[in-house]
Amino acid sequence: MVRLVLLIVATFVGNAVAADELPRRKSGLWSMSVTMPGASVPLTMQQCVDERTDDITGTMADRNKACRNQTKRTDDRLAFDAICKVGKTTSTTRGVFVGDFKSGYTVESTTTFDPPMAGMRNGVTKAAAQWSGPCKSDMKPGDVVMSNGTKFNINDHKSAKKK
């Protein structure tokens, strides 16, 4: 389930912006909240990042190379548009990242799928992230802890275990 949620987030946002186009986040513990179509409550998680594991757009998803991307950076904003082929579906995403990536950022994106993907025709994804301080002593860079206690490392996405 965790991987499915992260795959959906990455599909909405991850293919739209290449990781090298985003500013790097400050190393440490980031608290995130994501609202997705069909979810009754936001998905919350904490992630320990450093310069090697910082991938806002989702290491968990295989990047689809069949995307046409456009980005425009102004001050603390990064607007993006992308048209991607995901299997037989074309996804069209438009959104914006806002923030300094040192203390926090938000992202909002609107995606349409043609034909619908997993029964979904379109949706708006919103996320907010705040730097919380140094990583906890029991976390290493790449560790993600979901609100239900599931813990995994983005570098070892084959294992998801209960904390």
Labelled PLM ranges:
Residues 1-4:
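Positively charged n-region of N-terminal signal peptides that target proteins for export
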Residues 6-18:
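Hydrophobic h-region of N-terminal signal peptides that target proteins for export
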Residues 32-66, 149-157:
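Short, solvent-exposed loop/hinge segments that bridge or flank secondary-structure elements
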Residues 45-47, 67-70, 91-99, 109-113, ...:
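Hydrophobic/aromatic beta-strand elements that line small-molecule binding cavities or substrate pockets
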Residues 58-102:
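Mid-chain, structured segments of secreted extracytoplasmic proteins
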Residues 32-35, 79-86, 107-115:
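Short beta-strand segments that buttress and anchor functional surface loops
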Residues 119-161:
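Edge beta-strand at a domain terminus
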Residues 17-28, 73:
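N-terminal helix-cap/turn-to-beta initiation motif at the start of protein domains
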